[in-house]
C-alpha cells in the first residue's frame, strides 16, 4: 500500500522557508546535527509559535526549520493572480496537477497559455507550484 505524503520533507522545507519566510507553516523540524531531525506540529501557526519559543531552541543549539502540511500548502496557492497585464487562473487538474492558464489580448489576437505542474503526490505538486510561481515572480 502506498504511503500518502502529508507534509514537506526537510529539503523542501528548507527551500520553502527561503521563499515564504515561514508564511503559512503549521509545523517545524527540530534538527539535531546534519541528519537527525524530529517533526513537531504547532497548535498555532509556526509564526505565532516562533515568537514565544524559537529563541529557547536557538539557545539550546537546536535548529528549527518551518514545515508545511498539505492543507497549509494548498492554502498558499492563489486561485487567481493579476500581474498588471494578465489574469492567471489556477485550478486543480487531474493526476495531481495544478493547471495555470492565462489570457492576453495583444493586437486583437487572443492568446491562451497553459502551464501544467505534476508530481507523484499533492504535497510535491503544491511544492513545485509554489516554487514555479516564485521563480516567475507571481507569488
Question: Where are the regions that the model predicts?
Answer:
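Short, hydrophobic/amphipathic alpha-helical patches that form generic packing surfaces
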Residues: 13-19, 72, 124-132
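Ampiphathic alpha-helical segments that act as solvent-exposed interaction surfaces
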Residues: 114-139
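Alpha-helix boundary/capping residues
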Residues: 20-23, 77-80, 132
